[in-house]
């Protein structure tokens, strides 16, 4: 390359010296572009733009993003998670595939800036990942952890490490030797065992999140066990690092005074610094976080100054951890734990940094770290054999010692195996730990390569295997019939009422009043307030009956729900039992909380608010949540009991039951009966409502001319007629039920009938009857907009009918074991 010295004034006089080597300073990190401007001369103009630092980094970012997205597009269909795609991207760009001195290797290599820019970005990504995972983690999970989780967590880690060490010293001592000389150091072996026996909470949480098992009973148990595992292993690893520093340090304890040890011994200084930092996080940093929360007005965002100040402390803690010879993530993770999870502070930090860290920088960190994987060095069978044996033994021991306590606590065999697979899963923490150890010289290059390939294999096999072994929907299926049709007379009706927003409270209470609660026919209402999980990793289910007075002040904005339903309980004292819960979860997993609570409390009916709400005059839709709609559909598919979707309309003078009683009128309810199990379930609820003197029930039975002329022959129709006979007998006995039979021969006549009665009632009750073919609805399914409401329910809520009444759509229990 020829340089023109006249373009650089301070090199003009020395440029012609043949013995002088000149460089261009300062180095320009950015190019002048593909088409540089002649008005802005660049002394490095002869260098290709991609050889500049910043364009090179941007190209690597782009290639990594394209590759891992490409891999994940196909691998997710096989049940694999994103981390596997990140690893494959890194291996594809590593020395194993891109050989030295090839054009592709020179173009895609990060070695030129490995110790500067790429290393800095990777380190920042990794420590920010751990800080955010610390913010997500709820330490109260440890206090509420049961004996089962403690036993599994300790057994899978501490007991596994102990057993592995005994096996090594008693049986496998000669495995890591070559001609009598040790191939692997003692600390290398212990480090491998320690990492292999660990179950990292962030890794387990990410696996469960991507497999949508976070809300399952197995997922909660796995996360609780992982928390116990994390803390026990963190303490153990810190002790091991301290002992290694003592060994490597030139100064010895000997027979010196304790004061000399503390002052003169570097490992002791560092250990003391770690203890002081933990005390700082607990007694200074965490109170400051609560001070920030106190200074933030309710409903207002946290000031950016506070967030950036916290991030500066996070970077400082990483530097301190590195000085103390600890992993750089230890400091940020401790500070993350000290940040109160959830809104306003925890959620504000996550909303600001989570997407860029998890979506961009973390894949880049994994891919660039995997660049060091080099399969060409796997030449020695002794090396391979020793590492493979250590990894295999640790996996088998950990798997067995996780399965054993779970089985002893009465878990099914399949669930025990699934839990052991979850606890044995390896991810970004283990890969980062091996990369850090490789850079520090704790493990050899061949060890790093073999362990990295094992992590890739582990992450590629366990998630698909889990999907085949464990079906979370199976646990919601009941062994008994849990519906209103098969309830014993005068038995307690158990209802799970779901609240998505405060606007759902009044309509839900009004509907519960219509179920006729009395001392002879009591109603048990389990109220579940569902809120989106923001600012923490583990889902939370709060029982407000079990809360202390202190925790009631932090009820995640559920005060209105609790107070309103307590008043409902007082209004019907002795007839209504109310138990209120708040569930914090990600939207895709909320159905797990609903189904599990219904299963545990043996409810007969789940009531879900419809995903759309209307204005007061009914002229416009004021909210339309696709998330709530998908949640309702998931509950319909997996529910352990009957389900009702409640479409509330308050317009056109529609009244509540109390308002009708005050005006000496009755609350008008219409039950449309077309036939089928869902209609029979809906009619059972209508019969119960008829016991309330404030409610008038009208049962409109649709019958075709063919059905009227011919006698019923199929079993389903015979069940319909039997239930209708019971309704007619109640009418003859003086019950407040109006029964009418309408002859309808096609869908057009059904539409005309509904249009004629649409505004005569306060509430319609219909069955969903998904997939049931009927002469009454033939052809209408093509025009149905919301299939979760069924054909009749969808028609009643459509704008064409202009119905101003509320609608309750019932689906009978579907899942049975």
Curated annotation (Swiss-Prot):
The chain's coiled-coil residues are none
Cellular localisation: Membrane
Q: How does it sit in the membrane?
A: Multi-pass membrane protein
Q: Which Pfam family name is an example for this entry? A: CHX17_2nd
Main location (coarse class): membrane
PANTHER family, from UniProt? CATION/H + ANTIPORTER, CATION_H(+) ANTIPORTER 4
Chain segments annotated as transmembrane? 54-74, 115-135, 152-172, 189-209, 223-243, 273-293, 304-324, 328-348, 387-407, 417-437, 446-466
The reply on keyword Oxidoreductase is: no
Enumerate the InterPro entries for this protein. Answer: Cation/H_exchanger_TM (IPR006153), CPA2_transporter (IPR050794), Na+/solute_symporter_sf (IPR038770)
Keywords on this record?
Antiport, Ion transport, Membrane, Potassium, Potassium transport, Transmembrane, Transmembrane helix, Transport
One GO cellular component term of this record is: membrane
Its BP terms in the Gene Ontology are:
potassium ion transport; proton transmembrane transport
Q: What is this protein called?
A: Cation/H(+) antiporter 4
Similarity-based family: Belongs to the monovalent cation:proton antiporter 2 (CPA2) transporter (TC 2.A.37) family. CHX (TC 2.A.37.4) subfamily.
Which GO MF terms are attached to this record? antiporter activity
Q: What is known about what this protein does?
A: May operate as a cation/H(+) antiporter.
Q: Which organism is it from?
A: Arabidopsis thaliana
């Amino acid at each position: 390359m020829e340089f023109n010295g006249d373009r650089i004034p301070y090199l003009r006089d020395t440029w012609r010296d043949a013995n002088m080597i000149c460089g261009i300073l300062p180095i320009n990190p950015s190019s002048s572009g593909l088409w540089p401007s002649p008005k802005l001369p660049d002394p490095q103009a002869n260098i290709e733009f991609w050889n500049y630092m910043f364009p090179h980094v941007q190209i690597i970012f782009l290639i990594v993003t394209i590759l891992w997205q490409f891999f994940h597009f196909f691998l997710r269909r096989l049940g694999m998670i994103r981390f596997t795609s990140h690893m494959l991207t890194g291996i594809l760009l590593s020395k194993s595939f891109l050989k030295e001195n090839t054009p592709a290797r020179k173009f895609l290599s990060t070695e030129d800036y490995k110790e500067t820019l790429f290393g800095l970005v990777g380190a920042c990504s990794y420590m920010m990942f751990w800080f955010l995972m610390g913010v997500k983690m709820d330490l109260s999970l440890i206090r509420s952890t049961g004996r089962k989780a403690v036993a599994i967590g300790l057994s899978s880690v501490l007991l596994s490490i102990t057993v592995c060490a005994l096996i090594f010293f008693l049986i496998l001592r000669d495995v890591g030797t070559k001609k009598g000389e040790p191939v692997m150091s003692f600390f290398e072996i212990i480090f491998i065992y320690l990492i292999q026996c660990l179950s990292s909470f962030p890794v387990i949480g990410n696996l469960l999140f991507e497999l949508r098992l976070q809300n399952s009973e197995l997922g909660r148990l796995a996360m609780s066990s992982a928390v116990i595992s994390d803390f026990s292993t963190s303490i153990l690893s810190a002790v091991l690092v301290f002992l290694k520093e003592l060994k490597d340090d030139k100064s010895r304890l000997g027979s010196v005074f304790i004061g000399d040890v503390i002052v003169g011994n570097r490992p002791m200084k560092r250990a003391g610094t770690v203890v002081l930092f933990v005390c700082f996080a607990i007694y200074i940093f965490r109170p400051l976080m609560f001070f920030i929360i106190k200074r933030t007005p309710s409903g207002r965002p946290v000031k950016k100054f506070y967030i950036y100040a916290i991030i500066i402390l996070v970077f400082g803690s990483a530097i301190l951890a590195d000085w103390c010879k600890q992993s750089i993530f230890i400091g940020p993770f401790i500070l993350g734990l000290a940040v109160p999870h959830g809104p306003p502070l925890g959620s504000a930090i996550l909303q600001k940094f989570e997407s860029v860290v998890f979506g961009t920088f973390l894949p880049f960190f994994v891919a660039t770290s995997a660049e060091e994987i080099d399969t060409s060095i796997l030449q020695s069978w002794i090396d391979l054999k020793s590492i493979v044996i250590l990894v295999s033994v640790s996996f088998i021991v950990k798997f067995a010692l996780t399965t054993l306590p779970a089985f002893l606590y009465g878990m099914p065999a399949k669930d025990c195996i699934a839990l052991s697979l979850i606890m044995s899963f390896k991810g970004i923490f283990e890969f980062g730990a091996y990369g850090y150890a490789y850079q520090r010289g704790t493990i050899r290059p061949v060890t790093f390569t073999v362990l990295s390939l094992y992590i890739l294999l582990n992450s590629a096999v366990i998630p698909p295997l889990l999907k085949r072994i464990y079906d979370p929907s199976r646990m919601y299926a009941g062994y008994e019939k849990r519906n209103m049709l098969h309830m014993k007379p005068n038995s307690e009706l158990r209802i799970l009422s779901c609240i998505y927003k405060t606007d759902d409270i009044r309509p839900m209470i009004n509907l519960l009043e219509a179920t006729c609660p009395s001392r002879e026919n009591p109603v048990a209402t389990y109220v579940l307030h569902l809120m989106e999980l923001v600012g923490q990793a583990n889902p939370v289910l709060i029982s407000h009956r079990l809360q202390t007075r202190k925790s009631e002040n932090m009820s995640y904005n559920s005060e209105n729900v609790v107070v309103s339903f307590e008043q409902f309980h007082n209004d019907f004292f002795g007839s209504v039992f109310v138990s209120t819960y708040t569930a914090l979860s990600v939207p895709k997993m909320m159905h797990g909380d609903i189904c599990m609570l219904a299963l545990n409390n043996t409810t007969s009916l789940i009531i879900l608010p419809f995903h759309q709400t209307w204005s007061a005059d009914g002229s416009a839709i004021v909210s339309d949540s696709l998330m709530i709609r998908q949640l309702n559909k998931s509950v319909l598919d997996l529910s352990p009991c009957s389900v009702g979707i409640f479409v509330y309309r308050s317009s056109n003078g529609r009244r509540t039951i109390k308002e009708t009683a005050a005006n000496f009128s009755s609350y008008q309810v219409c039950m449309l009966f077309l036939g089928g199990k869902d209609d029979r379930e809906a009619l059972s609820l209508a019969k119960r409502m008829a016991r309330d003197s404030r409610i008038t029930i009208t049962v409109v039975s649709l019958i075709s001319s063919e059905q009227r002329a011919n006698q019923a022959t199929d079993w389903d129709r015979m069940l319909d007629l039997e239930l209708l006979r019971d309704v007619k007998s109640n009418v003859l006995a003086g019950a407040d039920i109006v029964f009418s039979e309408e002859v309808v021969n096609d869908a057009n006549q059904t539409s005309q009938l509904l249009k004629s009665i649409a505004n005569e009632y306060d509430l319609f009750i219909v069955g969903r009857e998904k997939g049931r073919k009927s002469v009454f609805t033939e052809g209408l399914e093509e025009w149905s907009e919301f299939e979760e409401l069924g054909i009749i329910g969808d028609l009643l809520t459509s704008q064409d009918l202009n119905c101003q009444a509320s609608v309750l759509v019932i689906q009978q229990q579907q899942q049975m074991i």
